[in-house]
Amino acid sequence: MDIKRLDVSHIDRLWELQTAYKAEIGEDAPGEPERARLAEAIQQGRIAFYGAWDADDLIGCCSVTAGFSTFDYAPSGVFEDFYIRPEYRHSGVARRLVQYAYRESGVSSMTVGCADCDIPMYQALGFSVPLGNLLAYGG
């Protein structure tokens, strides 16, 4: 298994995982406009994606969007888009991918917003500092 940062040349493989993730959680599949916006964001460096590969197969991905936090007055990242193909789960891929994304993104901390049912998984992966509630504003 190899883990590396993804770029816009990987958009087809990444899009397969994005679509599989949305299907697994019961959301509508994203369309071509969303794909184009994602490719543009990757191209412009507004989001960093990392991928786990088994030979030529992209088997897992995650993203880190960097910002600055007064939590520790250093670069921080929002960890999202985490998906491991079902047949590769519980094999260490997730842990390696999280560790790689943290190291390579250059952030001093990463936060994740997740469903209650996913809290034990994220805690097992090292997300252990509770920061209260995470709410999204949609304007």
Predicted regions and their residues:
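A conserved beta-turn-beta hairpin within the catalytic core of GNAT-like acetyltransferases
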Residues: 67-79, 89
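Conserved GNAT acetyl-CoA-binding A-motif
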Residues: 105-115
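Conserved acetyl-CoA-binding loop of GNAT-fold acetyltransferases
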Residues: 123-133
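Conserved beta-strand in the GNAT
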Residues: 51, 57-66, 78, 83
